[in-house]
């Protein structure tokens, strides 16, 4: 019976190792970073055919850089002198801000879309990652025309 008690008794080293492993797992679980963070600025109401600016700020909490393509998708056609698609390198220390100027004469729903893509000659030394989990992010806003 004494031998069984000796086998199942936890030594201080075993308890300490278990504590360190548990703390390591807890720290790893809390260390989740958001891939893409979108912030859009658009007035909620405008008058018909008024020039409107949509501002999109894109950030990441990942340590690696990514090549992104940002564009708009709308429920109705938009008119205006703007570039529909932007491509750039997004890094944690360098958030990107994109602007679109457009006009509309009716209420419209606009989706700002950011795709993470594989493209060369965008990020420095072509050092960029493409996440496995998801590569398309979007934010939907409504613009009411009076």
UniProtKB/Swiss-Prot annotation:
Q: Which Pfam families match?
A: SVA (PF05326)
Q: Where in the cell is it found?
A: Secreted
Question: Which Gene Ontology terms of cellular component type are present?
Answer: extracellular space; nucleus
Keyword set, alphabetical order: Disulfide bond, Glycoprotein, Pyrrolidone carboxylic acid, Secreted, Signal
Listed GO MF terms? aspartic-type endopeptidase activity; identical protein binding; IgG binding
Q: Which Gene3D superfamilies does this entry report, sorted A to Z?
A: Immunoglobulins
- Show the disulfide pairing: 65-91, 89-123
Indicate which residues are glycosylated according to the record.
105
GO BP annotations listed = detection of chemical stimulus involved in sensory perception of bitter taste; negative regulation of T cell apoptotic process; positive regulation of gene expression; proteolysis; regulation of immune system process
- Point out residues bearing the modification Pyrrolidone carboxylic acid: 29
Give the similarity note. Answer: Belongs to the PIP family.
| Assembly information from the UniProt record | Monomer. Interacts with AZGP1.
PANTHER family to which the protein is assigned, alphabetical: PROLACTIN-INDUCIBLE PROTEIN, PROLACTIN-INDUCIBLE PROTEIN/SEMINAL VESICLE ANTIGEN
Designated name of the protein: Prolactin-inducible protein homolog
């Amino acid at each position: 019976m004494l031998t069984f008690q000796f086998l199942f008794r936890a030594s201080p080293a075993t308890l300490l190792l278990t504590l360190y492993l548990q703390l390591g797992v807890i720290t790893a679980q809390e260390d989740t970073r958001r891939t893409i963070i979108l912030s859009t600025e658009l007035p909620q109401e405008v008058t018909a055919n008024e020039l409107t600016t949509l501002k999109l700020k894109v950030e990441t909490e990942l340590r690696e850089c990514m090549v992104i393509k940002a564009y708009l998708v709308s429920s109705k056609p938009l008119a205006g002198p703007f570039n529909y698609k932007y491509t750039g390198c997004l890094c944690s220390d360098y958030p990107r801000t994109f602007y679109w100027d457009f006009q509309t004469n009716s209420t419209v729903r606009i989706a700002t879309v950011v795709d993470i893509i594989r493209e060369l000659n965008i990020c420095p030394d072509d050092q960029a990652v493409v996440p496995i989990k998801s590569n398309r992010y979007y934010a939907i806003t409504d613009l009411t025309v009076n």
